[in-house]
């Protein structure tokens, strides 16, 4: 069937901020779909609250809205843009839930908008667990015994009937949020109570347990003519009971017989028919009992998902692109296979290699959280690796994770960790085999299929052989074929990695590169991407004779290094292409736009290690390598690349080193007359205590060479300092600990700056909303700044100019400043793209990363900026021509933009929600408004923490904050809020004439503060940290990964209860001040105003 002519304009809903369970894969699938719909001749409107996405770049659609993803805002956009259709299958759970709500509230009917890609009826059948079960049973498919309940009593009754353990799955939540496994009544009470709160419809499914069964997924696509294909089978290495997002997965499935696979394929076809999926991609999960072969359908997602992104990257079949075209009426036999250019999308992909995905966790960021893996997803990112065999792919995937070696454990600890899986489980399996355990014993404890365990055990046996045959060429070859890195072999042989590399070179042991082409090399690929293998002879990655630039990606998403760096990578690729270079992308992350088959000219799906990168350089011989766009990952290996005479494009490695080394950096600042906070370094506890004594408390402590403020802290006493120094030594072994004088009550600024070596341009000057001491990645920020004087802005421009020139920046850099008593201090400089580059680009309407990339290959900055000139500048700043001064004018948009962060605290009950110098946010949203108050209010709604305009406020404020907080709370009382406060805060409020209800702290009488929160009487909590209340910190003690130190105070109990009950909370005076302004604005009139992003630039 040809495309539908009855629709012209299509609205696509994005997935919002990156959270656990919904990450960069939706930017990748959304971008792909937008390109497909535009090329088919449709007008496209995109709405997303996340500015760090390629899909919100204006070139991919006819209208971009960066607005909160709520029904109210969507209705306004629909009213304004009048789309004919809504495609909700590309924005994850968020978009599906919104589509259901828009339909049920009659909004789609009101404006004549059709749902395409998935009918309302189908979404409900797939998403509503009770309906899904009924539908499957009618289709003759087996599902697990289960019951939907909406209260605790029914849940207890059901669990008694089914027998423990039982699985609890809240309806309509993401990544298993609020769910879990209950082994007894006490656990059931706890999980069900949380699950009923998390579920938007307040129901949970109690399901019989299939712990230990094998889990499989099929990625399927179907068109309107009934054609059905399986794109890829995926096997979870981990058994049922661990969320598939936290499982190690393998494609294609390795342990299914052909008969079992056909049975599963037939069942998948029946599922699609029964649910009524007429067009698009779906993901269907099955569980198989390894003893009896009994197969049950677990669930299906009627949309593109994390697994479909993985399946697309594993096979080269662009599921999202195909699904978008199917949604507008095309059939599979009308859509070309974009990789071969010869076949059609109706051909099932065939693959002659193995793909392994491993999740990346960061539980150390959430002290107090339960590290055990269960049905609630906890990982923040993932890597994918390709090899000719499972062993090779597994080895490559493990080194892509960029993790440190696991702690050495005794057998007792190993057994415990195998039985209770944690993120380190794979290390423990290898440790078990090293300690002499056999396959059967490990299988009993882990329920992982014996085939995988035998493969892993063989690797450990090879290690023993390596120890016996030092420098044997044949055993070296075998180790390389089995996925061992030069570094691992070097460790076993007790030599340097360089020596192993030389031995390989002397014996001509090199990898060859094979192609991912969807058809096992049956047809020639037009848009090739490659993986390395030592199990092959012919090199399929034959380099062209064009001038090439290689861009190093950022590897797996993690806290501190997320989708923002992929955004800058992709913009870099496009810029180099526009300048006539062939682009080579190297990355290991399957969720991203950078690893899409048509982003760069050539894609290498490889680990970002020195060894893997050097091999690609050997094959491609690029003009140079770009390390400035991928965050800390490429910077970490830059030194070794320079040693091997690889040309680094952009800012030189010498400058990178000066910026990373505190002593060298301080010396440079002194030479050019700039200030930094006084600091010292220490290599022992004694030395640290001495340094802190000289600087005076409070001090800021951090290890060198870390990302996202890992193990950073503000310390007030010598006792706390001692505890922290021990932790820092574990995080960054062999490097000294840095100790800074902490600047209290300073304003922190974040500056994104671009330079071509002569001219310097501040692209974004952002003011942090949170107090100094909160990691800039966790603080909301505003552009343009709201509290800087004209004189101060000019001084900042001069300061940044001096520093950028001294560091010889070519391209982009990020500088963090603090202003205290009108003095400017340099906190740090990063000569690379920062996580704020996408936000700045969207706020000012100028593609910062693209301009920076072009500068790296010799373009002139004023000439590049002239395309966007005149842009809005500060009131009173008049510039007729760019380039008259070496300091180019700083953009000063008329609209205010606020970046707010999203932190996954609800995934980790038990973690304290206080903000500090260690970054914990996974994603961000952007609020745009006529003034700061409107932008801040919209950012809070977008982040899922809408501020209330009526109700009661609970206030408990530390003594140090009372002077500033009391007048702000008085404003809220004047606006009609009822104020409850603990004794000390109440006294301070009463002395200002504020009417307040005194509420006892825990232990001072009932009903107390916690009772008040549990009763649902409070709509906002204001609680600041008192100086005698230590934050909880994760401290490593060798054997056990993390233990929590610090006591659980009343403040901690209030914060965690507010989080559990989904009550908005403010933990700093600064956020209270911003909230008061936002609430006042909201009380004056609606802030549900929507504007096209491009219109906000013209104001």
UniProtKB/Swiss-Prot annotation:
UniProt GO molecular function: ATP binding; carbamoyl-phosphate synthase (ammonia) activity; carbamoyl-phosphate synthase (glutamine-hydrolyzing) activity; metal ion binding
EC annotation from Swiss-Prot or TrEMBL: 6.3.4.16, 6.3.5.5
Taxonomy, superkingdom: Bacteria
Residues of the signal peptide: none
Allosteric domain: region residues: 945-1099
InterPro entries: ATP-grasp, ATP_grasp_subdomain_1, CarbamoylP_synth_lsu, CarbamoylP_synth_lsu_oligo, CarbamoylP_synth_lsu_oligo_sf, CbamoylP_synth_lsu-like_ATP-bd, CbamoylP_synth_lsu_CPSase_dom, MGS-like_dom
Annotated ATP-grasp domain residues: 133-328, 666-857
Binding site residues for ATP 1: 129, 169, 175-176, 208, 210, 215, 241-243, 285, 299
Family in the record: Belongs to the CarB family.
Protein name per its UniProtKB record: Carbamoyl phosphate synthase large chain
Gene: carB
